[in-house]
Amino acid sequence: MTGWIRAALSDAGTIQVTQRNYGVPMRPLTGPLAGHVLIAFRGGRDLDVQEALARRHDAYLDCLRLAGLRVPDTQMRLIDHAGVQRPVIVQSAVPDDAMLPHLFRQGGTQAAIGLLDRVATDVAEFWRRIAQRPERIGLYSPLDSFAMDEDGPLFLDTFPPLISYNR
């Protein structure tokens, strides 16, 4: 997959999509990663630190799912770029018209309230389920971090992994 990521990030056929938080999402239009969003982040030279970050990301994905949040298929890979290990998130793409801000603009007030209620219910359930966990866990949950499909809310923002961290 590393080769596919490198190829997609350097391909002129990969388009930048709406920026989310700290990374720059890109969507390959062709190739094996078409149908995915790639989000490349600034990395570092300390491999031990970057590998710990990758392990935390895996643990965070597990925590999100065990706590009831639905997350599209998501992986984090470290890509070596001139000695710098860059974290790259590879996530199954969600259609633009399924993103919560788009749904708010398309529906009326009652539809928006219904969407907010579904997201709030999932977020509250997340906090209820992690309340007794010993490690520090966070959830950065602005509305643009969610999409909606026929089964309910999808949480998209898995980086940085908010698990076992210090302030």
Where are the regions that the model predicts?
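Juxta-kinase regulatory segment immediately upstream of eukaryotic protein kinase catalytic domains
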Residues: M1-G13
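ATP-binding glycine-rich loop module of kinase domains
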Residues: D11-D62
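Protein kinase-like catalytic core scaffold
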Residues: H36, R70, I89, L154-L156
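Short loop/turn segments at strand-loop or loop-helix junctions that form parts
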Residues: I39-R42, V90-D96, D157-P160
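Short catalytic/ligand-binding loop motif for oxyanion handling, primarily in non-cytosolic enzymes
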Residues: D46-D48, D80-R86, A98-P101, A147-E150, ...
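Conserved kinase catalytic-core helix
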Residues: R55-L69, L103-D144
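Conserved structural core of kinase catalytic domains
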Residues: G68-R118
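Catalytic activation segment of kinase domains across protein kinase-like and atypical kinase folds
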Residues: E135-R167
